[in-house]
Design a protein with these regions (language model features):
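Acidic/His-rich, divalent-metal-binding segments that scaffold phosphate/diphosphate chemistry
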Residues: 2-94, 145
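Amphipathic, soluble alpha/beta structural segments
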Residues: 3, 7-21, 129-160, 185-197
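A generic short-segment signal for beta-strand/edge and adjacent turn/coil regions
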Residues: 13-14, 39-42, 100-105, 110-112, ...
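Divalent metal-dependent catalytic cores for phosphoryl transfer on phosphate-bearing substrates
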Residues: 30-31, 61-160
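Short, well-structured alpha-helical segments
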Residues: 39, 43-46, 67-71, 100, ...
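Charged phosphate-binding loop/patch that engages nucleotide di/tri-phosphates or the phosphate backbone
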Residues: 167-197
Length: 197
């Protein structure tokens, strides 16, 4: 039953549609015995990240970022919650470093594993646009607006495009509002899967 629920959370056709998790991530979550709710969360955030990277590519084609890294990071950012189950239903950050170590231990490069540790650390001067996009996807999937995070994304976009920060803010605000409009459906999807089976 657990494997069937996990498979549904990662791959089933849905209304509204969510992209399935990448095969590499789905295989890892199956191997780890991921709680179905975690897989559902990762799928929702991955789908939102996909919308964000498509928007950046269309809105600002000159902006340099690693599309595949952002998508992988969004799909695995909370993988450490497979060992810190209490953080699926309550606050905590132990899953961040644990997730990075878990991914590296399963052969994932440190460059990709870092998102598990950086997705809540957007104020760190070492994070790049890729990290910020993963962090943003992890917030906006549930329509949570974080002005400090959004300001950092706006600044990176304005610097890369040469457009005024207010122009970048208006454009980003528009896409975040559109993505946020479907938050209730994504939250309901996640909540439809159990933590413990």
């Amino acid at each position: 039953m657990t494997e069937a629920l996990l498979s549904r959370a990662m791959n089933d056709a849905l209304d509204p549609p969510l992209l399935p998790l990448p095969d590499r991530v789905a295989a890892l979550l199956s191997e780890l015995g991921s709680p179905p709710r975690l897989a559902a969360h990762l799928r929702a955030v991955h789908d939102v990240a996909h919308q964000l990277v498509e928007w950046v590519e269309q809105h600002s084609p000159a902006v340099v970022f690693d599309r595949e890294a952002v998508l992988f990071g969004a799909a695995t950012h909370d993988v450490g919650k497979t060992v810190h189950l209490d953080e699926l239903s309550g606050p905590g950050s132990a899953h961040e470093e644990a997730g990075q170590a878990l991914l590296i231990g399963h052969g994932i490069s440190p460059e990709l594993a870092r998102f598990a540790a950086t997705h809540a650390s957007w104020m760190d001067a070492r994070v790049g646009l890729d990290d910020l996009l993963v962090s943003l996807a992890d917030k906006i999937w549930k329509n949570k607006r974080v002005p400090d995070l959004e300001d950092l994304v706006v600044a990176r976009l304005a610097r890369a495009t040469g457009r005024a920060a207010w122009e970048e803010f208006l454009a980003l605000d528009g896409i975040l509002a559109r993505i946020g409009d479907a938050a209730d459906e994504r939250l309901a999807f996640q909540a439809s899967f159990p933590i413990h089976v």
